[in-house]
Amino acid sequence: MKQFKKKKSPLAQTSKFKSKLEEEFNNFLTKKKIKFGYEDFKISYLKPEKASKYTPDFNCPTNAKFRIIFETKGQFLTSDRKKHLLIKEQYPDLDIRFVFSNSKNKIGKKSKTTYAKWCELKGFKYHCIYSTNKFLPDEWVKEIQQQQVDL
């Protein structure tokens, strides 16, 4: 019996991004001429009894003490929420902002808490693409562009 090898699809993924949202956010920052890095550094943090690393999705250098970090999220899993609370506790000066596909999604099937409400309760800035039809609020874009003038 003759065996056939499976051919690889000519449409294999060529993007370096983990999601379409990350790719589109990358294109948005590029179009706005905002300097940024994509998953280009790691932040060490401790989970109880375990050293871990966090790689931010996008980071925009600024002339401020810290860069602005953007986490793009379609789904906001419990593990992500726990991780970001630990990082916020260990690095309170980091400016981590969430960019959600839809911040009105609930954090769980039985929960009444939305992604937006969770961010408000935990002190994180966030933005909703779905409700604004924008990747970032104009104020954030201006803030970053102003802080990158001298870089």
Task: Give the location of each predicted region.
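Conserved beta-strand termini and adjacent loop/short-helix elements that scaffold enzyme active sites
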Residues: 39-41, 99-101, 129-132
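A short acidic, often aromatic-flanked loop/helix-cap motif at beta-alpha or helix-coil junctions
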Residues: 44-46, 105-106, 131-138
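Catalytic cores of nucleic-acid endonucleases
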Residues: 74-126
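Charged phosphate-binding loop/patch that engages nucleotide di/tri-phosphates or the phosphate backbone
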Residues: 1-4, 8, 13, 113-151
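Active-site metal-binding core of divalent-cation-utilizing nuclease and nuclease-like domains
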Residues: 6-18, 28-66, 72-81, 88-89, ...
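Conserved alpha-helical elements of sugar-nucleotide-dependent glycosyltransferases
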Residues: 17-24, 83, 111
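Detector for Asparagine
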Residues: 26-27, 59, 63, 102-105, ...
